C-alpha cells in the first residue's frame, strides 16, 4: 500500500527515524521512490526545537553530533507546507472546538513536559491537522490520542469545516 502523497506528523518522522522494523522501512523506501516527504512548517518547528533542547542539555562532546543531525534534517527536507490563512482558519476552529489536550503532560518521557508545554504540543497538533485538511492529504502519525480526538471533534461539528473532507489518519505502525 504505497500511495500518497501523505502529510507526515512530527511523531511519524521520529518513529520512522528510530524504527528497525524491516516492513516499515520497505514501505518508506517505496514511498520515497514516488514522493517527497511532506510536512507542515509546524513539524519543522517541533523538530528544530527538539534538536535545540537536546543540544542545550547535552555534554559539550555530544553537541557536534546533535548539530550535525539537525543540519542533516534541514538539508533533507522535502515539501514544507506553510501555515497560510486557510490552515490558520481551520486550526482556529479546531482550537476553539477542542481547547484542552486529551492526555496529560508526558512524565515518563526522557524530558518531562509541563502543562504549558503539553498545551503547546496540542495546539501544534491542531495546526498540523489543519494543514492535512486544507491540503486534502492523509496524515501519517504515531499519536493516536491527539489526532483521533481532533478527528472526532471535527466529525461532531462538520458545519465548522465546510468544503473540507474528513481528516484521514494513518498510524505509521499500520504501514509495516
Question: How should these model regions be labeled?
Answer:
Residues 108-113, 117, 121-138:
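Acidic, metal-associated active-site segment
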Residues 1, 129-176:
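Acidic, PIN/NYN-like endoribonuclease modules and their adjacent C-terminal/linker elements
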Residues 1-70, 103-105:
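Short, well-structured N-terminal submotif of metal-dependent ribonuclease cores
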Residues 12-13, 43, 87, 128, ...:
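Alpha-helix capping/helix-boundary segments
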Residues 34-36, 76-79, 133-138:
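Short active-site oxyanion
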Residues 10, 85, 106, 118, ...:
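Conserved glycosyltransferase catalytic-site signature
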Residues 76-118:
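Acidic catalytic patch
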Amino acid at each position: 500500500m504505497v500511495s500518497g502523497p501523505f502529510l507526515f506528523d512530527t511523531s511519524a518522522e521520529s518513529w520512522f527515524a528510530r524504527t528497525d522494523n524491516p516492513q516499515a522501512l520497505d514501505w518508506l523506501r517505496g514511498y520515497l521512490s514516488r514522493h517527497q516527504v511532506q510536512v507542515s512548517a509546524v513539524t519543522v518547528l517541533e523538530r528544530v526545537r527538539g534538536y535545540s533542547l537536546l543540544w542545550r542539555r547535552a555534554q559539550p562532546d555530544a553537541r557536534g553530533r546533535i548539530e550535525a543531525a539537525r543540519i542533516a534534517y534541514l538539508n533533507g527536507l522535502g515539501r514544507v507546507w506553510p501555515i497560510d490563512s486557510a490552515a490558520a482558519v481551520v486550526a482556529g476552529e479546531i482550537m476553539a472546538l477542542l481547547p484542552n489536550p486529551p492526555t496529560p503532560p508526558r512524565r515518563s518521557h526522557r524530558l518531562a513536559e509541563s502543562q504549558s508545554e503539553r498545551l503547546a504540543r496540542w495546539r501544534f497538533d491542531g495546526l498540523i491537522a489543519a494543514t492535512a485538511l486544507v491540503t486534502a492529504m492523509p496524515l501519517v502519525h504515531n499519536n493516536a490520542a491527539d489526532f483521533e480526538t481532533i478527528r472526532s471533534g471535527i466529525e461532531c461539528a462538520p458545519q465548522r469545516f465546510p468544503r473540507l473532507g474528513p481528516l484521514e489518519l494513518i498510524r505509521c505502525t499500520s504501514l509495516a
